[in-house]
Amino acid sequence: MRHQDVAIIIPSRLSSTRLKQKPLQLIGSITLIERVFKQVNQAGLEHTYVATDSEEIASVITKVGGKVIFTDSAIPTGTNRTYEAFKLIPNNQNINYIVNVQGDMPFIEPSSILKIIEYLKNSKYDIVTPIVKVDRESVKASSNVTVAVDSAGTALYFSRSLIPNGAEEFLYHVGMYGFRKNALEKFVSLKPTFLEKTERLEQLRVLENGMTIGTCLVENVPISVDTEEDLKKAVKFYENISKLGL
């Protein structure tokens, strides 16, 4: 298998404030977390894991041949859960890169995962994350995050507000990160920062501490399921692609 020095970790927990038992919600006949895992697994990496505190989530994943790492329910963020899971991977001294894929993107494209891995390995960035060019209408919801970058594609700032102000085209941030191992270790050792807490975006902790985030363009905005309305959109999308035989 390719990228033996990379681990993909999908953090997933049952407790969600906006959508009860979110990972176990059905899209068609398959749970959200199973769909995420199956999409990620298509990237073809041996070290692919779901990190969870839930026996129910673990059961869903192991039944389809996936690997699960149990983590403490008190872990505060997905990135911290990713790091705790990484520490429990057997022979993890051979892993130099960790990809954190959020467990709420049921149609995430495997090509996007592979793209950030290649970009991370061939750059000097601490972290790499995908972005998509979109228009104003596509990102006006407060749950969406936009990013401002410099001419080289280095992230300058992330916000739940539309940035830059007055633009008609924006860069939508996809919730997936490729970390160098030492960057992930450093991130979890840092305390939450002012901008991070203000925007409720943990990636700002990286920028406020002088670390670098590179961005790479991907083609499509993946559906993220955070609310009941998001779930309805995901089900509708699934029904549409099923009719097309995709």
UniProtKB/Swiss-Prot annotation:
Reactions listed under catalytic activity: 3-deoxy-alpha-D-manno-oct-2-ulosonate + CTP = CMP-3-deoxy-beta-D-manno-octulosonate + diphosphate
Keywords recorded for this protein, A-Z: Cytoplasm, Lipopolysaccharide biosynthesis, Nucleotidyltransferase, Transferase
Record carries keyword Zinc: no
Top enzyme category: transferase
Pfam families with a match to the protein in the record: CTP_transf_3
InterPro entries linked: Cytidylyl_trans, KdsB, Nucleotide-diphossugar_trans
UniProt similarity note: Belongs to the KdsB family.
Full protein name: 3-deoxy-manno-octulosonate cytidylyltransferase
Native source species: Rickettsia peacockii (strain Rustic)
Gene name in the database record: kdsB
